């Protein structure tokens, strides 16, 4: 995806390295993708996914740098082939999709996992300790560099009109349910209740604030079930319509549940509210590496009333981050200097491949 860590690292390389340094750096993307326009200007350094050139370059690459498993380099991942075997032998620097903390991934991305990699980029001391103690890496293979995409983050919220970004994650246990089953699920009922809450509407009205609901693709088909009853202070934005990082930069506060986007918003010193009404089910299904009941930053709620108390407090106090969260940030974010991509490149340059 040409919005994520892989894209921003590639962009840094194209715009900051000399011709010799960037000569052999390439970005793979399907030319039919909506994101292709973001990288088209880099010409010969952009390779069409599953093209002949792509296959040839897979065979000869020194290292894969990606925000997902290197298995995604190839469309037919389940079928044995010469290309698949070649990918398996290549080293990978994992840039990550989001901070590893709120969801256990060691069975997939751990050193002994099904999609292990040689190098695992981390963002601070807390995450590096997770990578070492839970995933099996070490200080050399889990360097603290920060995320490439964080280099472009800046606070763009407007004083004229504040908005709260609501971005819940999907639930794996709802993956195969029917429409009727979904509509009686706690997940649907809780978010439907929140979005139609008269109290929420009053808070938004009294503080001249909007709520922007960024819709997960798997939730999109159900929006019309309650959309008509919702206040005009609630806006729905389908996934992909506006770049997510743009929404995070413009928002005044985030409401999520278990999504790793919370770290991006926290990185910008903005308040984060966690609505975890189904925490026990989530913890049983996925687990986490930190105790979310006791050690989570931000404000955590398991009921709508508690969540709205927090919404009201922050809306009435200018959406200023809690002091305890501001003081805790350095243990999560080693760097906030817009040089994360440079550190990643320096790490690559200083290691033999």
Regions found by a protein language model. Name each.
Residues 310-317, 343, 347-351:
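C-terminal alpha-helix
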Residues 47-56, 217-263:
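Donor nucleotide-activated moiety binding/catalytic core segment of transferases
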Residues 226-230, 260-332:
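Catalytic binding pocket for nucleotide-activated donors in carbohydrate/polymer assembly enzymes
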Residues 77-98, 183-193, 270-281:
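A short, gly/pro- and small-residue-rich
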Residues 4-10, 148-227, 301, 336, ...:
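Conserved catalytic-core segment of nucleotide-activated headgroup transferases in glycan assembly
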Residues 1-153:
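Active-site and donor-binding regions of nucleotide-sugar-utilizing enzymes
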Residues 22-26, 115-120, 211, 250-253, ...:
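Short active-site oxyanion
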Residues 72-74, 173, 262-263:
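Short glycine-rich, flexible loops that bind phosphorylated cofactors or substrates
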């Amino acid at each position: 995806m040409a919005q994520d860590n892989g894209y921003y690292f590639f962009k840094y390389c194209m715009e900051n390295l000399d011709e010799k340094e960037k000569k052999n750096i390439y970005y793979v993307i399907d030319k039919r993708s909506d994101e292709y326009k973001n990288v088209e200007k880099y010409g010969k350094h952009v390779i069409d996914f599953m093209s002949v050139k792509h296959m040839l370059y897979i065979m000869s690459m020194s290292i894969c740098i990606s925000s997902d498993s290197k298995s995604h380099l190839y469309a037919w991942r389940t079928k044995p082939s010469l290309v698949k075997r070649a990918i398996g032998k290549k080293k990978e620097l994992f840039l990550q999709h989001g901070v590893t903390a709120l969801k256990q991934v060691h069975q997939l991305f751990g050193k002994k996992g099904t999609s292990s990699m040689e190098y695992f980029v981390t963002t601070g001391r807390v995450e590096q300790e997770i990578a070492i103690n839970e995933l099996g890496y070490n200080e050399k293979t889990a360097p603290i560099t920060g995320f490439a995409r964080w280099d472009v983050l800046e606070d763009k919220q407007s004083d004229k009109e504040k908005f709260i970004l609501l971005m819940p994650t999907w639930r794996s246990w709802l993956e195969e349910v029917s429409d009727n089953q979904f509509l009686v699920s706690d997940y649907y009922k809780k978010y439907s209740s929140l979005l139609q809450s008269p109290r929420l509407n009053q808070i938004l009205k009294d503080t001249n604030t909007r709520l922007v609901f960024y819709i997960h693709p798997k939730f999109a088909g159900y929006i019309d079930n309650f959309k008509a009853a919702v206040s005009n202070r609630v806006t729905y934005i389908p996934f992909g319509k506006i770049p997510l990082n743009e929404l995070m930069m413009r928002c005044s506060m985030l409401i999520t549940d278990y999504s790793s986007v919370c770290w991006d918003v926290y990185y910008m010193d903005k308040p984060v509210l966690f609505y975890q009404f189904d925490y026990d089910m989530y913890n049983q299904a996925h687990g986490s590496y930190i105790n979310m009941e006791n050690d989570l930053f931000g404000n955590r709620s398991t009921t709508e009333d508690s969540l709205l108390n927090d919404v009201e407090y922050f809306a009435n106090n200018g959406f200023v981050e809690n002091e305890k969260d501001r003081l805790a940030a350095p243990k999560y974010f080693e760097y906030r200097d817009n040089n994360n991509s440079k550190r990643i490149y320096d790490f690559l340059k200083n290691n033999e491949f």
